[in-house]
Amino acid sequence: MTDFFKQKVTIYNDIPSDGVNARRFHRFVIDLCKIQKGIMQNADGTIEKVPNAIMIETKDVEHYKSQLEYALLPADEKDKYFTANVNDFVVLAEVDDVVTTSREFQELQSKYKNNGFSVTAVNEYIHGMAVDNVQIIHA
């Protein structure tokens, strides 16, 4: 593992109501992150400058679950993992704000508007290799 992946970020998942359970929010501190601002890597590997773009790349794939995998976890297992989806909110630091309502989620987004972002895309590169990573993007 390189020295690039030393940062931590905090993701707040915005989990919509499923008809049985009300809308809820899940906080998770993601370790082993690299934060890149103003550039994006395209699928073909080329680098492109994109003003205001932010990409979090994490090697913490051990704690990552796809949206479906996360939804299928038993309730007592969900705190051990994170997922990432469009409209989730990422703070570019480890924070401990508690969010339980839509209003608190909006307040969190306002509080960290200069040090956070709403997710617009997620790329998973998990193949059981040392280079495995998940990219969480705002573009």
Residue ranges and their predicted role:
Residues R23-A139:
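Short, conserved turn/kink motifs that form compact alpha/beta structural patches or helix kinks used as
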Residues M1-V20, G38-I39:
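N-terminal intrinsically disordered, low-complexity, charge/repeat-rich segments that act as generic
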